[in-house]
Swiss-Prot record:
GO terms for molecular function: aspartic-type endopeptidase activity. It comes from Trichormus variabilis (strain ATCC 29413 / PCC 7937). It holds the Pfam family Peptidase_A8. PROSITE patterns: SPASE_II. GO terms for cellular component: plasma membrane. It is a multi-pass membrane protein. This is Lipoprotein signal peptidase. The gene is lspA. It is an enzyme of class 3 (hydrolase). The lineage of its organism: Bacteria, Bacillati, Cyanobacteriota, Cyanophyceae, Nostocales.
């Protein structure tokens, strides 16, 4: 049996591994609330915890967010295992979303919160983590995939 949707699994593994590794580094290196200016006033590493979703949305809703993360993860795994062979951009997008959902989901189940540390101060944006980034990049990949697919109506002769 050939391994189906290989790019999906590679993207999911890399996203999950990078997310967990960077969070581990932050927790081991910084005290809660500590910040390290990388580009002062523009970009910092700031260790905070988040009981909400990506970019601090739905703060304090960790209970249903942990189940949402699990549900999304199981749905994507089912799609990759039981569904058709996906196009490359779809595999990449869904894989990155799975890796990010699993990374934040594990934090929510194990800790009750998510570790965030990427702090773009220039635009006064919420502190976030690599899982949030991978989910966002995955969504962009899916948008690109949908733009590349031409509707059947374009192929009809007029």
């Amino acid at each position: 049996m050939r391994f189906k949707n290989r790019l999906f699994w590679i993207a999911a593994f890399i996203a999950f591994f990078v997310d967990q590794l960077t969070k581990y580094w932050v927790v081991q290196t910084f005290s809660l609330g500590e910040t390290l200016p990388i580009l002062p006033g523009i970009f910092h590493f700031t260790y905070v915890t988040n009981t909400g979703a990506a970019f601090s949305l739905f703060s304090g809703k960790v209970e249903w967010l942990r189940w949402l993360s699990l549900g999304v993860s199981l749905l994507l795994i089912g799609l990759a295992l039981l569904g058709p062979v996906l196009e490359r951009w779809d595999q990449l997008g869904y894989g990155l979303i799975l890796g990010g959902a699993m990374g934040n989901g594990i934090d929510r189940f194990a800790l009750g919160y998510v570790v965030d540390f990427l702090d773009f101060r220039l635009i006064n944006f919420a502190v976030f983590n690599m899982a949030d980034s991978f989910i966002s990049i995955g969504i962009v990949c899916l948008l690109l995939a949908s733009l590349q697919k031409s509707p059947d109506s374009h192929h009809r002769s007029r």
